Amino acid sequence: MKQLEKLRDRIIQRVDVNLRRFDFDVPGFLKYYVPLNKMIKYYALYGITPHHPLHYQFNYSNLAGSNLLGRCKVDNSILYKCDIRGDELKSSGDVLHYEGTDIPLDYDETILIKDSFLIKTLVHNCSHNPENPELFLIKNTVSSAYVNIHGSWTEGCFLNPFSTVDLTSLHGCAVGTFAYLQVGELWHEQIPPGQIWVKAEDQFDFKYNYPVKVLKKYIDFHPDRRPTGIFIDFLESRKEDFQDVFNVVHFSNPVAVPKSASLSPYAVVKPKTRIADNVLIAQHAYIESSVLGKGANAQEHCYIIDSKLKGNNVTAHGAKLIDVVLENNVFVGFNSFLRGTFEFPLRVGEGVIVMPHTIIDMQASLTIPPGHLVWGLIRKPQDLKEHSIALEDLAKVKDKLNVGAMEFAGNGKAFVDAFRHRIDHILDANGAYYDGKKNRGHAQRTQHIAYNIIQPHPLGVKKGVYPTIDIRS
């Protein structure tokens, strides 16, 4: 495995140089966190569909256990059990709207992952960098487990476990555990664990920080040891179910799936689950004893257990619902963790927006009223007062607002409108509005994917390194 070791050390050197201003042990992390002998245990998959441009290039890389779709190039990188989902990349002729300027695309957009080490990471959406709209770049970057890189350029960055970078370009940044960023662009910043930051220049700025001591109960991470906490225990207890899925070549749906819905063969769906029209269940999702109403979705790394989704519900990448009832048009953001109990299910009212990286962990009855925004840590009914606001009231804010530890500045209506517009776009893109003829989305376009297996060199100095491959239609 000399070539694989050389590749790892090359990535370490490049990322370490970019993060030299921060006190962070990149070599110690990468040499401990994922042993290289695991890199030869798992095959990789690439998908072919009639709806997505096809071009894959893999050069001097390892792709162990990863799933790729769309136009993807991987160069001098290691991807361990990642989802590289290029089904929302821009196409030639599309127009990027940026600060009043229309930027037409001359070529189909491509995801390029170069000199990077990604671990159990989702890469999705498309580039929002106006300087190079045809390229979604991840370079000199390390991401650890259950990270979401969503429409975000990253150069010279380290992304800690369960962090999300969303519609943001990062340059030389370290993002803390369970932090969420949607801020446009950052240079050489260190984001603390548990910071939730949403900012649109000259419009609004939303910020919340989790109490460090409490957050560690859910997810705690140090570079010299594996992550620990409730999130990890929850995921580890269900890991074997996914192993069974990846051991099967010919798939059959475990439950009835309507013609307008899509269930990935690489999702886990347990009995006593019902799926309605226009439902999307992505790879690495886990559904058990639940009902997904018309237009609901479960994106990558979502877990929905003993829950009911009434319809047109967005469960964004990494969100988890246990003993939860969602009324219509509820949005649950990235990596959120919502847990009720069998005796006291958590009820979320119609039109509620659950901010990304929200934790609602209840041992008592709680109903979130319709039309509210919720965020942060809620463990008892009294917490709702300092972690929620009616969207109607937020829309009236024109200057500053503090609710508990949450700080908001700017135009509340612009914030509410931006979220509602994005949620509507997600539902549309996922095919929730499909009427049998119009408004096709992912639920309809990903029903027929041919998956192909590729594997690395099995022996010798190149053991673990995949052959150089160029696949195109």
What are the residue ranges of the model-derived segments?
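Glycine-rich hexapeptide-repeat left-handed beta-helix
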Residues: 5-28, 83-138, 145, 149-154, ...
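Extended low-complexity, polyampholyte segments enriched in Ser/Thr/Pro and acidic residues
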Residues: 1-17, 27-50
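Short, conserved secondary-structure segments in the cores of folded domains
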Residues: 70, 109, 251-253, 265, ...
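Long, low-complexity, intrinsically disordered segments
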Residues: 469-472
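Beta-propeller domains
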Residues: 258-289, 293-295, 299-300
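Extracellular beta-rich repeat passengers
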Residues: 41, 46-64, 68-69, 73-78, ...
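Eukaryote-specific, low-hydrophobicity, charge-rich regions
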Residues: 43-44, 53-58, 237-263, 268-270
